[in-house]
């Protein structure tokens, strides 16, 4: 078990009564300033570090503050979409220079001039009110009593923002919704409850003699009660992956939730980072943001509406997570961020790195080669750490938590030396591009009921896919990982996806995903079995797969639209294509060497029909059976990364019950022939022999009942039964399946 999570588990067991104790005991905020991220007691050590080992970081910070003083202006303070980094740089330099006994008032005076009479702080048309609160706390002791009241009153007006109450209300959003917490710019846009901004303000102005003292106390009491008793259990259910979407997590929660929890810790001494379970959001966040990194670029995978970045907002909060949890993986990411220049615009964040926390990479920590984030139902797999040529894969199925979450249950991705299986290319917002809110950008099974009328159908017609819960705020069942196990030779996951489809068309939909971790480039395979039962045989079923490079089809190929659409039919069809190393776009440095090749063997249904569709004008086609959708659903950002220009559509003969069985081989580019695959079927299972005699895998997957089976690795005499339940002891030493 990873050392960090083992230690965290012990800490959690020791803190088993923390929630109840905190509910019973009033919470005291320290009297001194600063109290947000820093304390007066820690200033001496910080100043000493700035004069010693942290001199380079401090030089960058002071240079930014000095430039602002010389210019007489704080950059971006009027930009609603930007973080006013100079504001925090000046405030932090004041603290350090004052602690060192050097002149420091010029930094405070610049902030006072910018704030003026406080109107700009209180301007509800646009104000980075969360960052103003941090700066207020840091320069508090340099303000006279009148200034403290003036600016504190301006800040205090925000405590009832949007909700009309100085309390956590969860109005128009749950704990797992990004706008409940606030965006990374801590401004008014996309701020509903704005828990982070309001907490920072309540902590900053407490005791300053403002007219909002009672509101500040009410908000702190609300936090002290609701966070331990409601939020942390919700975060335990969700786990380390921000389930709403990676993109919306990076817009705010990945940054600002650690801000809130760390501000509470430094101001009260209560460490709520450790109040949850080891698989809760904050303890597991650094793992999720590590597993998201695809080896060939070192950047986060394009899983939903996010991806393509290396940190996704974690650069600013990683130092806080690292020191609150003594998390070596978060510390490793913070040091990487510093080396990558992530703190160039906001050098204040680098000074929050605690040098006493040991940094360790995934390989140094001995992290397993697969990981299940059980709450969101995210499974990540890879062949190795510290190898840009490694294989990486993702498979996902989980419940619907919050509004922006995409309906993509059963979706999977694979890469090696570039993308091999991706999601539909380009980017888009749920409002400007409804096609992006449907199923056809993901790799899943469609069941086409011609009478289905999906939500949000503008330029997003009936696609045969999942129910569209996007923008619904209530948690609901959609998909679930029912089995999971990781071994040195394989990673197995199974999911029940039935609840994700309309009951009028689907009786049962499951997917089994087996990654066979053989020798990279030679005998590495993925087996995918879909068991699909519809309510009517007439509801046609398709296996949809997005690939970045134009695939070559085996068998007799019928060109339907030359250069864009072609079809082949038969039994045991083989399709092949090359990886695309530049699938993340021209701004992403490719770390891997060469390319890889993927072979796909369609074993079931037999016979099957495979349509290859893509290229200019055909990348975003509607469902082939929907008459009103026969056009390219292009959008304003459809040409952006990730680049994934082709779709394979495997059509099954009409029947109520259909099995889709595919074997994917991940090979080196020079390999021209797929390894042998032999299929035998009986009433209980599909049975496969994969590979040459010397390196043969034997796999059995059940075709009814529990989603189990068996696997025999090359050289092994006995078959190992596959699990029918979730096994995560290698991650935590206890199973982490969240309660319903």
Task: Describe the predicted segments one by one.
Residues 20-24:
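Boundary at the C-terminal end of the N-terminal hydrophobic targeting segment
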């Amino acid at each position: 078990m990873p050392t960090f999570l083992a230690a965290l588990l012990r800490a959690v067991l020791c803190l088993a009564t923390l929630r109840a104790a905190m509910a019973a005991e009033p919470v005291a905020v320290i009297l001194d300033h600063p109290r947000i991220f820093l304390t007066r007691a820690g200033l001496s050590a910080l100043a000493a570090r700035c004069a010693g080992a942290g001199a380079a970081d401090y030089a960058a910070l002071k240079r930014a503050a000095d430039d602002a003083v010389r210019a007489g202006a704080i950059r971006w303070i009027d930009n609603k979409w930007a973080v006013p980094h100079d504001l925090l740089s000046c405030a932090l330099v004041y603290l350090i220079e004052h602690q060192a006994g050097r002149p420091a008032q010029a930094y405070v005076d610049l902030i006072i001039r910018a704030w003026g009479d406080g109107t700009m702080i209180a301007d509800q048309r646009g104000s980075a009110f969360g960052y103003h609160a941090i700066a207020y706390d840091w320069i508090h002791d340099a303000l006279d009593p009148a200034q403290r009241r003036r600016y504190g009153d301006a800040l205090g007006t925000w405590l009832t923002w949007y909700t009309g109450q100085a309390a956590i209300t969860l109005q128009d959003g749950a704990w797992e919704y990004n706008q409940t917490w606030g965006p990374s710019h801590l401004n008014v846009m996309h701020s509903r409850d704005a828990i982070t901004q309001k907490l920072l303000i309540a902590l900053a102005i407490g005791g300053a003699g403002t007219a909002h003292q009672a509101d500040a106390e009410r908000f702190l009491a609300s936090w002290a009660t609701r966070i331990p008793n409601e939020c942390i259990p919700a975060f335990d259910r969700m786990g380390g992956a921000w389930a709403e979407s990676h993109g919306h997590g990076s817009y705010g929660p990945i940054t600002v939730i650690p801000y809130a929890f760390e501000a509470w810790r430094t101001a009260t001494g209560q460490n709520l980072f450790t109040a949850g379970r080891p698989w809760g959001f904050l303890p597991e966040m650094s793992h999720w943001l590590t597993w998201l990194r695809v080896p060939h670029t070192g950047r986060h995978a394009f899983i939903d509406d996010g991806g393509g970045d290396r940190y996704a907002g974690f650069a600013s909060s990683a130092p806080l997570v690292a020191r609150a949890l003594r998390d070596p993986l978060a510390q490793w990411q913070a040091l990487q961020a510093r080396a990558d220049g992530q703190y160039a615009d906001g050098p204040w964040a680098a000074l929050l790195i605690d040098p006493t926390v040991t940094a360790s990479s995934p390989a140094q920590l001995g992290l397993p080669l697969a990981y299940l984030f059980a709450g969101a139902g995210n499974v990540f797999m890879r062949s190795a750490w510290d190898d840009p040529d490694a294989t990486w894969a993702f498979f996902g199925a989980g419940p619907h938590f919050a509004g922006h979450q995409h309906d993509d249950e059963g979706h999977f991705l694979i890469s090696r030396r570039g993308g091999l299986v991706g999601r539909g290319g380009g980017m888009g917002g749920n409002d400007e591009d409804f096609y992006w809110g449907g199923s056809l950008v993901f790799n899943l099974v469609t069941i086409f009921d011609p009478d289905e009328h999906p939500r949000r159908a503008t330029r997003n017609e009936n696609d045969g896919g999942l129910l569209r819960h996007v923008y619904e705020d209530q948690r609901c069942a959609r998909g679930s990982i029912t089995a999971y196990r990781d071994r040195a030779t394989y990673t197995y996951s199974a999911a029940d996806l039935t609840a994700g489809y309309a009951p009028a068309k689907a009786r049962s939909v499951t997917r089994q995903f087996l990654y066979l971790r053989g020798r990279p480039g030679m005998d590495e395979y993925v087996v995918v079995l879909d068991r699909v039962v519809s309510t009517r045989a007439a509801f046609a079923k398709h296996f949809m797969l997005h690939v970045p490079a134009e695939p070559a089809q085996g068998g007799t190929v019928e060109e339907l639209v030359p250069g864009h659409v072609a079809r082949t039919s038969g039994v045991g069809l083989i399709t092949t294509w090359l990886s695309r190393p530049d699938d993340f776009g021209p701004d992403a440095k490719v770390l891997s060497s060469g390319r890889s090749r993927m072979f796909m063997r369609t074993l079931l249904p037999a016979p099957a029909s495979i349509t290859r569709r893509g290229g200019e004008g055909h990348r975003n086609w509607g469902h082939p059976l929907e008459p009103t959708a026969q056009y390219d659903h292009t959008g304003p950002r459809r040409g952006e990364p990730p680049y994934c220009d082709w779709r394979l559509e495997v059509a099954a003969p009409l029947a109520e019950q259909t099995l889709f069985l595919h074997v994917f081989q991940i090979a080196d580019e020079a390999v021209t022939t797929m390894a042998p695959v032999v299929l035998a079927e009986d009433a209980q299972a599909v049975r496969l022999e994969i590979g040459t005699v010397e390196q043969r895998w034997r796999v059995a997957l059940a075709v009814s009942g529990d989603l189990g089976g068996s696997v025999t690795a090359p050289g092994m005499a006995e078959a190992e039964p596959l699990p029918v339940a979730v096994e995560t002891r290698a991650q935590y030493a206890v199973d982490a399946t969240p309660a319903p």
